Amino acid sequence: MSDVENQPFFNIQRVYLKDMSLEQPNSPAIFLEQDMPSVEVEVDVKAERLAESVFEVVVSGTVTAKVKDKVAFLIEAKQAGIFDIRNIPDEQLDPLVGIACPTILFPYLRSNIADAITRAGFPPIHLAEINFQALYEQRLAQLQQQAGAAGAPNGAPNGTTLN
């Protein structure tokens, strides 16, 4: 093999909106409410190996807006990307998939959610930036805690070992 074939390689093959749904169970009456809605946001990241060097990473977002006890809208979206990742050491692969890939995808998710909310007739809601490194580290700590509670060795996704 040549040196070029052994070089670390990272490429975005595709970014796409995998799924999106919007519900407005209390429309049109909710538009007459004068109170400001409370907004809850949930974000999750999942990754799947599609082939030896190909990964699908999905950033899911759920935004729920309520006025008093009535749901104004509920939007769920999944922004996905297919990434070609080669010649990356195992200890660097999981952080790349769990931090860098979601960081690339999140602006697309945020834009799609904001657009859908506006098109649904509501004032725009712009999701704040997310520190995917902190989210990743939190997940590793949870995995470590679960493994410790089960009496298993420390482990992280993709088989990397935590120190």
UniProtKB/Swiss-Prot annotation:
Cross-referenced SUPFAM superfamilies: SecB-like (SSF54611)
Self-association and partners: Homotetramer, a dimer of dimers. One homotetramer interacts with 1 SecA dimer.
UniProt key word Chaperone: yes
Lineage: Bacteria, Pseudomonadati, Pseudomonadota, Betaproteobacteria, Burkholderiales
Name this polypeptide is given: Protein-export protein SecB
Sorted UniProt keywords: Chaperone, Cytoplasm, Protein transport, Translocation, Transport
Entry keyword annotation includes Glycosyltransferase: no
Subcellular location field: Cytoplasm
HAMAP family: SecB (MF_00821)
Gene from which this protein is expressed: secB
GO biological process, one term: protein transport
Protein function: One of the proteins required for the normal export of preproteins out of the cell cytoplasm. It is a molecular chaperone that binds to a subset of precursor proteins, maintaining them in a translocation-competent state. It also specifically binds to its receptor SecA.
A Pfam family of this chain: SecB
InterPro entries, sorted: SecB, SecB-like_sf
One term under GO cellular component: cytoplasm
